[in-house]
Amino acid sequence: MKTHLPKIDVQRRAWRVIDAKGAVLGRLAVQVSDALRGKDKPTFTPHLDAGDFVVVINASEVVLTGNKETAKTFMSYSGWKGGERYRTVAEVRAKHPERLVLHAVKGMLPKNRLGDRLLTKLKVYPGAEHPHAAQQPVVTAYAG
């Protein structure tokens, strides 16, 4: 069976808003990554960018199960000797709550140029306000 190649001029990129309030982080990230890739569309093609723009609001109120709030750590490396820095989820949530969602979604996208391009279509905001009202986004319910 041949891979279906949709015409570029036919594709319409919709804008979706997903409220992360009370949503489990991993389940939310699956829904967001599928929308970014376009896996819920009949024109899905693995090597093409066919997804929609996704705006995630209330990222600071996302939920992690178990004791991941204190046990899970994020590591960053400055490039210098002894430059490893470990932060817990609670520390990341206090300073940059949108990075929790970004990190989870990035891990579910392809590890190539297509994944980098898809990630630019994700907009995450810690509160309920977002500057994308002019794009007339459709509110998508969190299915978790």
Question: Model-found features: residue ranges?
Answer:
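Ribosome large-subunit tunnel/peptidyl-transferase-proximal elements
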Residues: 1-103, 113, 131-144
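C-terminal structural segments of small proteins and small subunits
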Residues: 102, 109-131
